[in-house]
Amino acid sequence: MTPTLRRKLEALAERREELQHLLSDPEVVSNNDKFRSLSRELSQLEPVALAMQEEARAKADLSAAEAMRNDPEMRELAEEEILAAQARLDELDAQLALLLVPRDPRDEGNLFLEVRAGTGGDEAAIFAGDLFRMYARYAERQGWKVEIESDSPGEHGGYKEVVARVVGRGAYSRLKFESGTHRVQRVPATESQGRIHTSAATVAIIPEADDVEEIVINPADLKVDTFRSSGAGGQHVNKTESAIRITHVPSGVVVECQTERSQHANRDKAMKRLKAQLVEAERSKAAAAKAQTRKLQVGSGDRSQRIRTYSFPQGRITDHRVEGLTLYDLPNIIEGDLDALIARLLHEHQADELARLSEGT
């Protein structure tokens, strides 16, 4: 481990002691929001503390084994214990380095999934539908809920646009690298000549804003429209203007919801999504400024970035952000088997973050 990373570990150990002291302060205990926030931070540092304690024990074992090596009768046993202790220290060194990768506080939370057809006409809408189904099936495997907030079906299947809320622990941590442009190469069902077409769809992954995140939305900045829903709810939704469209005039962000029977419920859902979009826009602006000095291969979340190509004739998926990341398992992946792909992206992200930490940036 580099000296820079070791100093960061020591700083985290000091912060843990400071947090333990703060959480016993009556003033902090009486402030629910602050107490909850500091408790969450302390719980995130516990794995680091446990690994450092284990490292200290392994170092003590190594020292004892090295001392025992001076005894001729114990030398053989000492050599075995030295090898075991050194192997454990190497393992803990790698573990501690990964624990230094900053945890995104949004990782455990829910998200909004937006899939939109891009270039390619009807085939793009069909592909957008395929992508949405891929994520929905992956969510089902994880035990998450997928709630469609609004959709615009394509004329020949799929979606021109679909927005859903994905609810489940760790949802954002697993899907946050999916934002960007996804391209497909295949022979459309409507293609009589058997020619391969290329079309695209864009995906946006937006973390749901936490209740404690402060963002002030001036009601005067909102333009609210109602319209008849075409969503769930039977005939009732077509008789009343229960669907809501909210435009945040200063930013131009537009959200809508039509899945609930009541206008009030649709408005609540739409406002939750609007808050998430505005919070994420501020985060993206800050991240873009930070990234000007350094190129992030994974996790930029830029919707205009072409991140992946799905080549059906070859059964191949290529992620363009990671060198050599090509998987010949398209049939299973498009059916929601995303674990191998996500694992590679997470590994690349961790390596990228560790490189940044080692450089002290």
From Swiss-Prot:
Briefly state the modifications made to the protein after translation.
Methylated by PrmC. Methylation increases the termination efficiency of RF1.
Q: Where in the cell is it found?
A: Cytoplasm
Q: Which GO CC terms are listed, alphabetically?
A: cytoplasm
The record's keywords, sorted A to Z, are: Cytoplasm, Methylation, Protein biosynthesis
At the top level of its lineage, which domain of life is listed? Bacteria
Gene Ontology MF terms in the entry: translation release factor activity, codon specific
Coarse class of the protein's main subcellular location = cytoplasm
N5-methylglutamine sites (modified residues): Q235
Please give the Pfam families that the UniProt record associates with this protein. PCRF (PF03462), RF-1 (PF00472)
Gene3D superfamilies tied to this protein: 3.30.160.20, 3.30.70.1660, 6.10.140.1950
Q: Which InterPro entries match?
A: PCRF, Pep_chain_release_fac_I, Pep_chain_release_fac_I_sf, Prokaryotic/Mito_RF, RF-1
Function according to Swiss-Prot or TrEMBL: Peptide chain release factor 1 directs the termination of translation in response to the peptide chain termination codons UAG and UAA.
| HAMAP family in alphabetical order | Rel_fac_1 (MF_00093)
Write out the similarity annotation.
Belongs to the prokaryotic/mitochondrial release factor family.
Name of the protein this chain belongs to: Peptide chain release factor 1
Q: Tell me the organism.
A: Xanthomonas campestris pv. campestris (strain 8004)
